[in-house]
Amino acid sequence: MKFRESKNFSLTSISSEIQDFWSKNDIFSKSFNKKDSSSFVFYEGPPSANGKPGIHHVMARTIKDAFCRYKTLKGYNVERKAGWDTHGLPVELGVEKELGISKDDIGSKISVSEYNAACKKAVMKYTAEWESLTRQMGYWIDLSDPYVTYTPKYMETVWWLIKNISEKKLLYKGYTVQPYSPAAGTGLSSHELNQPGAYRDISDTSVIAQFKCLDGELPVKLKNFYPFYFLAWTTTPWTLPSNTALTVGAKIEYSFVKTFNQYTKKRITVLLAKNLIDKVFSKNFYKIDNENELDLFNQNDTKVPYFILESCKGVDLENLKYDRIWEEAPLPVDNPENAFRVILGDFVTTEDGTGIVHTAPTFGADDYKAAKSAEPEVPPLQVLDEKGNKVPLVDLKGKFIDNIGLISGKYVRNEYYESDSIPDKSVDVEIAIKLKEQNLAFKVEKYSHSYPHCWRTDKPVLYYPMESWFIKISDLSERMFNLNKDINWKPKSTGEGRFGNWLKSANDWNLSRSRFWGVPLPIWSNEEGTEHKVIGSVEELINEINISIEKGLMKTNPYSKFNIGDMSDDNYDKVDLHKDFVDDIVLCSEKGLPMKREKDIIDVWFESGSMPYAQIHYPFENKDLIDTKSNFPADFIAEGVDQTRGWFYTLHAIS
């Protein structure tokens, strides 16, 4: 059999001919304008046009296109609305780099208005490249009427959703220890930390620190062992100066052990969980059966003997006092008399460490909860800054405050330094060296473990005390878990395995982001924080501003040219809901007090998860599309597996 050979065969020419044919004959729009055809609902995950498309976008779009074309050929109407994700950290960090500024410069070297204008310009930088790729690969998506997340209509729907959540009593303000990215200058939500690759294996300096027990109110059964040290293990030595408690398990058995400090060679008695003695006293130690053999130890010996004494239960240790380990650190500003004592916690285990947990309430979620639940409550180590505000020993840049000894003004992690100014010794190493010299370090060694990193800056996160607005996901987790069973995941293991199990114990959603370019939290509060007003629409905001004008809190209404009820784009172009506009608006509380907007913007993942509603300006327009379920929920979504903890999660949570 002979096959005809085309000598002038050109894939490029054929591609152009097909594209021209589709364009001239309006084939794409005809494909989803079939009368009396059932709809197949597809949601397009919005890319950001501030970066160029990559090969992974081609792969994802190929899968999307194949299924949508198949359903079209089966007779369905398959509308495919394009979208642009225009807010968030990727945009802001790119603009900061381009302008040669940092977050701290915004509001001083450059106004918030100028900064947001630069972000708005940058976010559509590569639109032409995206549209070109879309055409070249034959991906059918409606680029003529995309949803754009920075538009007033989209933002208004996001506000409406927040108000709706508030009316369901699922929105609250809380002061908690939460993931925080010093490099990005903002808090993070738990689902952001569960992005693939967020946890990375790193090697840190770990310390088993010696906390010297005070003899003030020792029970009779423990007096015979005085003086002794509590042994507590940490993989974050930089948190030791902020220690205010040691946590033990009430039912755990703890043993007193006589030995020598391997660095100072001083004789010491230490206390740790009985089940962990063999693990802690490994390598450079050996067990003896007669206490008198300790007298045979020579300071030049390479191996250190230890002798096990009697044991007690964790409950016997409750409220014992100890010497603070970092003398240069100030006392807590609140109730210092309740600090530096042993408390009980049900999270303490004997799987690793020493069975005694170093507790710094300012830098650990479990630490914070344990300190709060203790009676009396253990205070966090906070001091007053120059403005009289309570702050921890580490600032929002990840740097120690001044006047706390050799660590003053240093970053808690070397990754926070500029590449040309990284010190030879990290703060962890410096702290370990000092504790060795003071006979307060029992063991110092490298420890490999998994540690969370910011998904956008690739820098390690801190757990930091902050006030934020949360969605009470914990009240919804069971329903979310059960509804997840109705989703037809491909492969099943993706949704029903790790993701499904994660939903069972999902944490409350931290909405607050300390940034500038995004949808502002639509919450106004009085100075005392006792009254709050959540705004759910442009109309509501205009009406509230008019009340403020009547009460003398504002002179003019910045949105006076907006015509309520007119849903045209031209009318909505008269409104800007971004931070640089709404932050100047003062509302009036029910008691007649001035109310200012809460300073943060909304987590950009909430924006993208609002897409089913916001893309059609629900409920202000197209209300029937959602209410009749003709355009909700989606029949088909296809994205990378990383979106199980991103867009898929937020779509699920918001719905």
Please describe what each predicted stretch is.
Residues 2-13, 32-144, 220-230, 237-655:
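Non-cofactor substrate-recognition interfaces
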Residues 172-175, 442-444:
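Acidic/polar loop patches that form or flank catalytic/metal-binding clefts of enzymes
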